[in-house]
Amino acid sequence: TTKSKSRQDNFYKVESKASQVIEDGQVLLEMKMSRLGGKIIEVKKVYKSFGEKIILKGFDYTFNKGERLGIVGKNGAGKSTFINILQQIEKADSGKINIGDTVVFGNYSQQGLVVKEDMRVIEFVKDIAENFPLASGGSLSAAQFLQLFLFDPDKQYTYISKLSGGEKRRLHLLSILFRNPNFLVLDEPTNDLDLPTLGVLENFLSEFPGCLLVV
């Protein structure tokens, strides 16, 4: 039908745009990450439960520099609770979590972007930082970083309240990466992000030298 043909054409347009984004995103391969020391996170004998439901039982783990881990489990298994405990957003029932002094978390959560919606997009990003450092000694401006995430100059001066749901999620992701973290925590990012944004994220992560934890 005409409608299904239109959907098919639209898919190929999006796919093409995503590929272009990945090519344009090569500049991110020279990013200068915040320094990460030898001590990352040490988890010792951590317990967590909700009533009779056990989330963690004597959990031990030591994170190493550059480590990439995936967490899988059914809905309600406690994955989000676990990553929140690691970042000390939630408290464990017992045990110790020692976080290195140089660790800078970047946390993409299911809660979404919390920000004053009467701000313009560019103002919100500049409140985080003016520039994103590159290994070459140069930097990307807030406006350039926004363009990399598909916010053209006109869209950058749009009020956040006027953005679509997908654009707000993209801005949420961008705001986390622009802080230049060295330990990224991504809670089910593929649930919320569109194909072009996932293309940019994939390119970013392919050369990200820090620790990565993906649910």
Regions found by a protein language model. Give the residues of each.
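Amphipathic alpha-helical coiled-coil segments with heptad-repeat character
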Residues: T1-S4, L198
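Interdomain "pre-motor" coupling segment immediately N-terminal to P-loop NTPase/helicase cores
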Residues: K3-E15
